[in-house]
Every structure is written in C-alpha cells, then in structure tokens.
Amino acid sequence: MDQQRIARFTLAGVADAEVSLHPFTTEDGLGLGLTRFRRDDCDDVVLLVHGLTTSSDMFIMPEHTNLATFLLDSGFGEVWTLDYRLSGRYPYNSETQRFTLDDVAHYDFPAALAELRRHIGDRRVHVITHCLGAVSFSMAVFAGTVTGIASLTCNSVAMVPRTPLWSKLKLSYGPPLMEYLVGPCHLDPRYGTAPRLTRGWLLSKAVRPFHRSCDEPACHMLSFMWGGGKPIFSHDKMSPVTHARLPDLFGAANVNYYRHILKMVRAGRAVKYDRRDPRHADLPDDYLENAADVTTPILFLTGDRNHVFTDSNIVCHRLLESLAPGRHELAVLPGYGHQDAFMGADAAADVFPQVLDFLKRKAG
C-alpha cells in the first residue's frame, strides 16, 4: 500500500466492523475517547492501550494485518481502542502541564473503564497494553483504581522499568535541559520538518549523525527520545510504508514523564512520583506493596532486541512469580525490539498468535 494514500488518524485499517466513537471526561477535566470495533456478539471484550506519543492508530494500521483486525478475525467480536492523555491524537503532550503516570492511573483508566462498562455491562474485559500504557495500566490494576480485568498483556515494560545507561543519562538531564535551556517542554519526532534554524530543526540535525541506520529524521528522533542509542524497533521487522509514516504515528512527548520514569528506574519498581501530592493520597507510594494480592493473570511480552526497556519484563515476570506463582507468563520475541511487536509487518504471524493463545485460555 502506498503510504501517501493512508490518511492520518484513519479508521480504514479495520474492515467489516461496526465502528463508533465514545468520548468521555476524566475527573481532572480532560476529554478522552474510546473507539469501538464491533463485529459479533461476544462474552469477552478486548481493550487496546497504546504508549506515550503513539495512539490507537498503532493497533489499526491499514498497511498490514493489525491487532484489532486479527482479534476480530480470531473470534473476539468486540475490540475497543483507547486514546488517553498520552495519545498523539490529543494536544496534551505538547502543553505545559506536568502530568505524571500517577495521573493516568488515577484519572484516565477508571474513567475509560466506566465508559466501557456503560456499553458492555459485566462482560469480561481483557486489556492489551504497550510501553507507558503498560506501566500506567499495571499501576492502576495494582493500586486498585481499576478492577475486574480478566487478563492483562503488557508489552516491553510494566511494573519494573529498566533502561540502558545512556537512557538513564537522558532521563536525568533531558527534562531540565529541554525546559530551561533548549526551549519547549516536549520532544517531537517531527522536528526534522520544522522551519530551518528553529530549535527543533537544529536538535533534529544534531541527533542525525548518531543514528545512521536509516534516512528517516523521525526515526532518528524517536531513537533519541526513547532508544538507548539504538532504534526503538528492528528495522527488518517494519514495513517500509510504516517506516515512512512514523511522523503520522508518533507525536510529541512531554519531558515531565521522563522524570517519573527515572524515579521508577532508580527505585527498581513502579512508585508514586510525588508522595506529597494530595490528589494522589489514595495511591500507594510503592505500587508493588500488595502485589501478592493481585489476582489478574498477566502476560509479559518483550523483544530480545528491546533497546528501550531492555529486560524490564523478564525481571518483572520473575519478581511477580516469586510473589504469586502461576499467575504470570512471559514470551520473549526473537528479533523484535520495542515498538515492532505490535507494529511490525509480520507481527500477525510472529506475535499476535501468542497473545491470542493467552486470551483464549483466560476467556470463559
């Protein structure tokens, strides 16, 4: 498929399904939205949750068999995608608010599940998550802000974020440098197309010599924003069409989220960003403090070339299995990195069947 023919934010990647949009608001005043793809009546509903700077688009891409279509074709007759405050479809990541993942776990997911339940009732809900969506949704489950999840799949990272050394340095010094010296409070993979000699354009040019794996400026910026000096996916796993669409599929990232990630990396687990914040007084300081009591079955996915969160999910699986044996599974994906597990050209053959097997075993 010619990437020029793929419209930004298109829903055309999911065929033969009834599509409906369901906006909702959070307790702290943000407008968010769910998209419902319904084909048949079913007892098990699947919710797809993206990561930071991507959006629901990563699950409905038309250039190859996407996850939403795969699940519908495999008998899960109702699939929902969520766009929350981390979504590239919204302006929140490029604004000046200093949101944290506590905000996401406290406000976004409870509101999303309430809206979802309003339409599906008490049917079973299985949640598939990616990147910081996996971290924050896991936080919500372990904090109890969302309940009644039949199964949870987490790609790349979850409750034990770990990064390469270079990433730790960027997490430490990047936010203050961006906010107080370079300029904007966010990083954007589209800086390569910014007006010449602007700060964003200059940053893109400065990054380029260190990322010689391709000629796509957005790919270089994404590697700089998230990779440990290497791309966030294995290039041989990505369709050239998808690679050319990176500026459409990824948006800005507010650097304050990096501060929260750094705090977790240093703590070795998911922790609250600010213990003194009265808004989050009911959230645990340590999200793993009652981990043994969480009964939700979890599948951890990770590529063996994950240059963003390295062995985070391997370590998380080992830790949670020591606390609650038998509730957690791990699948290591040969040749895959961070993003390509869900967005890769052959993910429907290499990755999705493993997720499907887990879902079917946890379904009624």
Residue ranges and their predicted role:
Residues 6-38:
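N-terminal cap/lid segment of alpha/beta-hydrolase-fold proteins
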Residues 26, 33-91, 313:
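Short, surface-exposed "cap/lid" segments of acyl-processing enzymes
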Residues 50, 125-134, 303:
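Conserved alpha/beta-hydrolase "nucleophile elbow" surrounding the catalytic nucleophile
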Residues 98-119:
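Alpha/beta-hydrolase active-site loop
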Residues 118-122, 132-272:
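Alpha/beta-hydrolase-fold enzymes
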Residues 294, 300-302:
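Short beta-strand/loop motif that positions the catalytic acidic residue
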Residues 307-314:
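Conserved alpha/beta-hydrolase "acid-adjacent" motif
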Residues 327-364:
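Catalytic active-site module of serine/aspartate enzymes centered on a nucleophile-bearing elbow/loop
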